[in-house]
Amino acid sequence: MTDPTPASTPPEEYPNADYRQLDRSKLSEMMQRYLEVKEQYPHALLFFRVGDFFECFFQDAVTIAHELELMQTTKAAGKEVGRVPMTGVPHEHVYRYSSTLLEKGYAVVICDQVEDAAVAAKEKRQVKREVTRVLTPGTLTDDNMLKGRQNNYLAALVIAGEHWGLAYADISTGEFLITQSVNLEQLTQELMRLQPSEVLFPVNAPDISKMLKPGETDNELPDCLPRCFCYSLRSQKPFSLGEARPRVLQQFQLKSLEGIGCEHLPLSVRAAGGLLEYLEDTQKENTTSLQRPRTYTLSDYLILDHQSRRNLEITTTVRDNTLYGSLLWALDKTNTPMGSRALRRWLLQPLLDLKGIRARHDTIQEFVNNHQLRQDFQQLLRQIYDLERLTGRVGNNTANAKDLVSLADSLAKLPQLAALAEQAKSPYLKALQNLPQSLEKIAEKIHNSLVESPPIHLKEGGLIRSGVDANLDEMRSLATDDQQWIANLEVQERERTGIPTLKVGYNKAFGYYISISRGKAELAPDDYLRKQTLTNEERYIAV
């Protein structure tokens, strides 16, 4: 990644921005930990949790302040070091800011606090911090970072002479496809069709894990690769057949690759293995739930070069390169994001198989002829959320309670779709009758387990209904009893001391305390030990 500092800005305006020029031993303990993490991800921007903020230091602070138009300040980094550049964002907004950086082609690392800061403070040491997320343009699953009606593809390539293998996946939906062919011009056109958010490419260079933003170049990239994409340069090792083949077999619990039709496609297997290794490297504790790779052949589809797609205005117009006015804009009357993404794929990759084309036409004709059936389908589909991405987040362990409710609501509608399909003649629609009955049971279980309006964030608690789990009910009862005990204590102490405004509170520093306003402090009994003095109150503990 190139140095994003504006060329017109004199380097002396950013003293200590380059941490490589500093004596590490003289840095504060926190700054030393920051640099330990930074050196593991030298080509990413590092957000480092400090209290209620995520802070960035050194050159990252300069870059982030410039790209996000944030205020840049400084922070003490050690007595003999002085101050270094610093930029910070509130912890609750870190993903919103990260999304903007990802759109600009950066990778972002989130290093969060993994223990209670009060515990570390009590033991007089630094709070433990670990990398919890590595965000790159091709590995996003959060809805607010994705375009609902467009796939977010991560692609991986292996090139050997004129032959090439390609694997690409949308980890937000689980789609995973591979292909292999000859002719580098076809590779260029396939990439232009897919418009991947990120492309992995193995190189023989010491500076691996480097990320090239759109428009940047590198001597390691062959001329056939369009420079309009974001490229992550990776080590050759995970792209070798010796590592890639067993990784693919293990990931999908296969005994051979014949079952997915790629035993004879070594370059595509290597690309798939490299992609899986990258997900292992970036997703940390979040598992990635991908479907088994689907092998396809370019000759099964009409190949449209980039110029033809542009002239035909399939997804964007020639005039201003926007969706409005394009063929996709005119045709996309779909009722779900899933349908919109599928329509985009169909337009960009037209079938050549006559049987498949007729099957699609027959389905459309049935909807045209049967107004009531069409209306019933539309009404039901409008009540179904983005099942592909909902199940993707569940599989990736990133779903929240709202996602689970949306998933259950959507699954509960599928039996009604299956019932509608009984009236249909088209094989496409008839296939809906084969929906597993277990889906309805899953929806019922979710609805019966969650409260009616669960909080969005899992850490808030209060998600599970009473009666679902006996141990949880017992713990909840104990917590409720504790709250009642505190309320009773407050009433008791008010009566004993004659202080009607006395309160019982809690903080992480010294636990439960008794609060008395400064004006009533002289009424505090002898068995109250003062622990803290504030502007308007005194805080005590009972001895």
Please provide the spans of the model-predicted regions.
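Amphipathic heptad-repeat alpha-helical coiled-coil/stalk segments that mediate oligomerization
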Residues: 239-246, 303, 318, 405, ...
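Acidic, serine/threonine- and proline-rich low-complexity regulatory regions
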Residues: 394-395, 490-502
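Extended, amphipathic alpha-helices with heptad-repeat/coiled-coil or helix-bundle character
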Residues: 136, 385-395, 502-516
